[in-house]
């Protein structure tokens, strides 16, 4: 075959084909479009994660308004990017997002009462957040776990900034004996949350044979070290409970899960017998018995919150979205924060969201998607007693949405196109 004949067989135009990096082999048009969509979905999800990370400070001084503008401005940018791949605004029916939308609608109704600008603004952001999630529904239920991979990458970037902060300013990062983010301020509890989710999701993927053992060991080792360095009890307990539930859902079908549970049970028994004193001291973090009894001062806020006088409307619908504080102190409980912000209505809707996802997972066939969803929902359920986040844009609401995306079938051609 002559050179001219070879050239004649090449595509006449590169407008419908992209080149593979470093190969010079053109991609088919459909594959090129799919790659573009995957990248933009990843950008949207990364912007949603940036939005929920929030801004409380940085190693290099950034004006507060500018820092908050970066994180809060990520939400409308995420919607705009989502619209570039969902131009016809195709929305798949979804019960979970309907429940989240009910929370947003209730927040709008409550915001019509005389409130500060902050309440109205938080309500608007909640509506934006649910809208962004709904724009991504055509890519929910994918067998390639696209959104899970996007979530892991986004959390890895956050934890990467935490580790970089340890190298740059170790005294600030671990000066309080708890690992925090200093390059971009991330509290210890939030660092622990991200590390626990990466640890658990990676472990579940290994349970199902989706990751090789060597890669899994590297990831869970790094995430485990970060989690231990934060000395966060809630994240540790929630992760263990979630892994137990996810593992039990696979224990019949996966031999490696049965072996791991047997080994973990034996090691736990040995650790409890030989290291019980050290473990108790480590988890106590130097706190007294009274501090542990009142959950590090949380109950001192919960009592006055519940006894605060309310009229019938405020008891049912709450006072509107706030910064999850009461008298200037953090509430640190999703259920009490929901009661404060959206009343009994918010508490009931949050409970229905969790029950619906657990029931939906129960009727799914055994597999990686069901196990991942069970891990995420169980983690959020356990953490919800001492963490906040279901009634507003937060990592917990984002992870519940991720769990919901794993429990629905892939989109049909009608929604994909």
Positions of the model-derived regions?
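A juxtamembrane structural motif centered on a specific transmembrane helix
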Residues: 1-41, 85-88, 401-417
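Hydrophobic transmembrane alpha-helices and their immediate junctions
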Residues: 31, 37, 342-381
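Interfacial loop-to-transmembrane-helix boundary motif in multi-pass membrane proteins
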Residues: 40, 95-102, 135-163, 208
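Long extracytoplasmic/lumenal interhelical loops at the membrane interface
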Residues: 58, 282-345, 361-365
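Aromatic-anchored transmembrane helix interface
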Residues: 70, 74, 96-108, 115-138
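Alpha-helical transmembrane segments of multi-pass inner-membrane proteins
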Residues: 148-174, 186-249
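A membrane-periplasm/extracellular boundary helix in multi-pass inner-membrane enzymes
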Residues: 169, 247-289, 308-311
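Transmembrane alpha-helices of multi-pass inner-membrane enzymes
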Residues: 375-381, 390-417
């Amino acid at each position: 075959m002559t050179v001219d004949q070879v050239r004649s067989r090449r595509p006449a135009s590169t407008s419908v084909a992209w080149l593979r990096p470093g190969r010079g082999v053109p991609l088919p048009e459909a594959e090129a479009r799919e790659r573009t969509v995957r990248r933009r979905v990843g950008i949207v999800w990364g912007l949603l994660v940036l939005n929920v990370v929030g801004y409380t400070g940085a190693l290099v001084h950034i004006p507060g308004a500018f820092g908050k503008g970066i994180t809060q401005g990520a939400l409308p940018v995420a919607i705009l990017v989502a619209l570039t791949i969902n131009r016809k605004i195709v929305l798949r029916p979804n019960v979970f997002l309907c429940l989240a939308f009910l929370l947003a609608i209730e927040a709008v109704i409550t915001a019509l009462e005389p409130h500060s600008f902050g309440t109205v603004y938080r309500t608007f952001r909640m509506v934006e957040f649910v809208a962004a999630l709904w724009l991504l529904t055509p890519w929910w239920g994918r067998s390639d776990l696209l959104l899970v991979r996007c979530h892991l990458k986004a959390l890895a970037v956050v934890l990467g900034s935490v580790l970089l902060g340890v190298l740059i300013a170790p005294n600030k990062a671990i000066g309080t004996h708890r690992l925090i983010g200093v390059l971009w301020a991330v509290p210890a509890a939030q660092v622990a949350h991200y590390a626990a989710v990466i640890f658990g999701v990676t472990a579940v993927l290994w349970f199902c044979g989706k990751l090789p053992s060597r890669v899994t060991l590297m990831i869970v080792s790094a995430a485990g070290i970060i989690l231990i360095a934060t000395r966060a009890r809630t994240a540790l307990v929630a992760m263990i409970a979630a892994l137990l539930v996810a593992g039990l859902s696979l224990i019949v079908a996966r031999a490696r899960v049965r072996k791991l549970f047997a080994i973990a049970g034996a090691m736990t028994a040995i650790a409890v017998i030989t290291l019980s004193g050290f473990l108790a001291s480590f988890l106590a973090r130097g706190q007294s018995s009274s501090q542990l009894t009142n959950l590090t001062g949380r109950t001192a806020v919960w009592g006055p919150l519940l006894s605060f006088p309310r009229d019938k409307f405020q008891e049912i619908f709450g006072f509107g979205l706030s910064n999850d504080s009461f008298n200037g102190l953090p509430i640190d409980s999703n259920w009490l924060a929901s009661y404060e912000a959206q009343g009994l209505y918010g508490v009931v809707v949050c409970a229905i969201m969790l029950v619906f996802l657990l029931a939906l997972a129960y009727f799914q066939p055994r597999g990686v998607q069901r196990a991942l969803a069970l891990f995420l929902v169980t983690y959020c359920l356990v953490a919800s007693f001492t963490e906040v986040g279901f009634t507003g844009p937060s990592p917990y609401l984002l992870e519940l949405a991720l769990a919901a995306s794993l429990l629905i079938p892939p989109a049909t051609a009608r929604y994909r196109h």
